[in-house]
A protein has these predicted regions:
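PEST-like low-complexity, intrinsically disordered acidic/proline/serine-rich tracts
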Residues: 1-202
């Protein structure tokens, strides 16, 4: 489970990246409204949900409580990359926003490389974009009993320098993942809050 908020390093957007961010409307463009993961980063950064890892001889399985997502990631080099997305929900719906992935070990670290993303958002709170040319690297290792992840987004059409995020996760002893069973969301609460604030200010 996520152990504290994720941290991000310097974000320097290109002109195109800045334009996409400027055009972003949380109440319209957030894929979460439709139970769609906006990006792998958005899934890692979600608090209070569980994640299960399973190592098989030829692949790594990552199951997320969030949106009931399941990632099947083959071990190997670039030739292991498949055309279809690596992530589905338990109903079998594919999510290209999470990309197509392959993985390898470098010492005690698992490196997951993902490509072929659908356009989405790394940070839905403020519309930090990813695009179809985006390549990501997730570096996972255990340190001091915690899972650490460094997540790097590379796309010179969107970022002047790679955008890097850091996460840490605490191990918990739990049984099977509960079902998330997402239903289409809305931001009625946001509108109601704004109406209340406007009334107070009048």
């Amino acid at each position: 489970m996520l152990n504290g908020p994720s941290l991000e390093r310097e974000l320097v957007l290109t002109e195109l990246g800045q334009q996409i961010q400027n055009d972003y409307d949380l109440l319209v463009d957030d894929p979460s409204l439709y139970c769609v993961p906006a990006s792998t980063s958005r899934v890692w950064a979600n608090p209070n949900v569980r994640i299960v890892f399973e190592q098989l001889p030829d692949q790594v399985l990552i199951s997320y409580e969030f949106y009931d997502l399941r990632r099947v990631i083959p071990l190997g080099d670039e030739s292991a990359l498949q055309d279809r997305p690596s992530t589905t929900n338990i109903k079998g719906t594919y999510f290209q926003e999470m990309g197509s992935s392959f993985a390898r070990y470098e010492g005690d670290r698992l490196i997951i490389e993902s490509r072929n993303h659908a356009p989405g958002y790394i940070r839905t709170s403020r519309g930090v974009p990813q695009g179809e040319n985006t390549v990501t690297l997730e570096e996972l290792w255990i340190e001091d009993g915690e899972l650490r992840i460094v997540h790097t987004y590379i796309d010179d059409t969107l970022y002047e320098v790679p955008f890097v995020l850091d996460y840490s996760f605490a191990r918990i002893e739990e049984g099977e993942l509960p079902l998330y069973e997402c239903t289409d969301a809305d931001y009625d609460w946001f509108y109601e809050l704004n109406n209340i604030e406007e009334e107070v200010s009048q």
